[in-house]
Amino acid sequence: MQRYVEEWRHTISRIGRWVDFDNDYKTMDPWYMESVWWVFKQLWDKGLIYQGVKVMPLSTSLGTPLANFEATSNYQDVQDPAVTVLFELEDSDAYLAVWTTTPWTLPSNLAICVGNDIEYVLVEDKESNKKIYMAKERVSHYFDDIEVINTIKGSDLVQQRYKPVFPYFSDQVKDGAFVVLSDDYVTTDSGTGLVHQAPAFGEDDLRVIKSYGISAMVCPVDLHGKFTDEVSDFSGMYVKDADKKIIEYLKANNSLLRQEVIQHSYPYCYRSNTPLIYRAIPSWYVRVTDFKHKLIDANEQIN
């Protein structure tokens, strides 16, 4: 840390930047660390520290979560696989068509989300002879000429149960998994109007699952983005590299309706220039929302 102090002082002075070198502080200084612990203790005494789980941007190359503002500093246009997967309903011979741009999250699927007021149609795919539910507005994206068997609202699908595509966490049914839920964030702008829910890898997914009081939760990916042994077929594989194998699995099990490639803007780690993933992180958090109004009021007093 101290090796290039003189060179640093010389360079900063030459470029005309003002820095108070003689009264600086470093985060490695013991007195500075003590001050941080003091602040933490004050927050603890006020009941503003809690232990919880939050879905956060994760740098798998560094093995550490990033702050949200860090995650927005390095977006890149990339190509990713997108798949439409068929989930069979428990009590009928129909399937739910679900679209996702993160195939690697499918082994962790615990629910499917619809929009209460969205119209869904039941159609019969002539190629597979399967009856499939998808949003009425999205049918033309998948089929040129198709017969509509039935039209319902999303609310009619809520609480219907379906069979998991992957077997790894089938026991989670006892905790309320593999059921259709609803939420206002579901749209028909893209995909099928049915959204795959993997609460360990999506902020909305976790929020919706919790709102229904479902306790099921699985996270078979470590901090370096590799599948754990729970997902036996892909154990040890980096999640992005596993996409191809997962798609092959879906094809082999007749669960794949469509495979495509999309181009979109995706967050990268600003330090390592590698793709970020979003993952549930158990940690200690500050209840900022409890005093957010005080922060805003204080800001308004600043000239």
Where are the model-predicted features located?
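Residue patterns forming the tRNA-binding/recognition surfaces of aminoacyl-tRNA synthetases
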Residues: 1-107, 159, 185, 189-303
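Catalytic alpha/beta core of large soluble enzyme barrels
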Residues: 108-222
